[in-house]
Regions:
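Primarily extracellular surface-attachment and macromolecule-engagement regions
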Residues: 1-2, 103
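Conserved Radical SAM active-site core
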Residues: 40-156, 160-171
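Short, flexible active-site-adjacent loop segments at beta-strand->alpha-helix junctions, enriched
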Residues: 27, 160-162, 183
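Residue-level detector of conserved catalytic or cofactor/ligand-binding positions
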Residues: 175-184
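Conserved, mostly hydrophobic/aromatic
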Residues: 21, 30, 132, 156, ...
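N-terminal pre-triad scaffold of radical SAM enzymes
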Residues: 3-57, 74-83
Length: 184
């Protein structure tokens, strides 16, 4: 699965203390999206302009010449970026980061099981968010199955913008509902 973040000890994405697994990929472009780095399905270079110090270090270390600092701004040529990570590693302001990594469902389960004691004490569990989790429907259902086999409470944050059949595949896993409307 393509994951961009795993947030531990979350309290706003379902009941109790939860671990939120943020998945990459979303077909929507909502202007209020709180996770714009989740939109693209693949790993991507994400630049936070407000953190950029304007030092030009990123340009100096890029072996592909994909980073250019000009006119007080950083410009990226993503089509030639090799994703080596040198620019993100050297950035003193942490303005550059590669967002997204491939994780197997079993690897995600191992990660979230580290917080099992918190779930049991608080009535919490695991929330799958994004992006749009159903953009990875087949892998999502497999992950839900593995989480349920561990006896974990699950919730999926979704806009529901997928065919009913895809959504129904997840129904046997007793997923809870975590609504973004409650936070707006």
């Amino acid at each position: 699965m393509r994951v961009f973040n795993i947030e531990r000890f979350a309290t706003h994405d379902g009941d109790g203390i939860r671990t939120v697994v943020f998945l990459k990929g979303c077909p929507l472009r909502c202007p209020w999206c709180s996770n714009p780095e989740s939109r693209e399905p693949d790993r991507q270079l994400f630049h936070t302009a407000g953190k950029c110090l304007g030092c030009g270090s990123c340009q100096k270390v890029c072996p592909a010449g994909a980073v250019r600092y000009e006119g007080g701004r950083v410009h990226f040529r993503v089509e030639i970026c090799t994703e080596c990570g040198a620019c993100a590693d050297i950035c003193p302001g942490e303005a550059l980061e590669f967002v997204g990594r491939q994780m197997e469902a079993e690897e995600i389960v191992r990660e979230v099981l580290r917080d099992r004691d918190y779930y049991e004490e608080s009535g919490g569990g695991v929330t799958l968010s994004g992006g749009e989790p159903f953009a990875q429907a087949g892998e999502l259902v497999r992950l839900l199955l593995l989480l349920k086999q561990q006896g974990l409470n699950t919730a999926v944050e979704t806009a529901g913008q997928y065919p009913t059949e895809r959504l129904e595949e997840a129904f046997p896993y007793e997923i809870g509902r975590a609504s973004c409307r409650e936070r707006v």
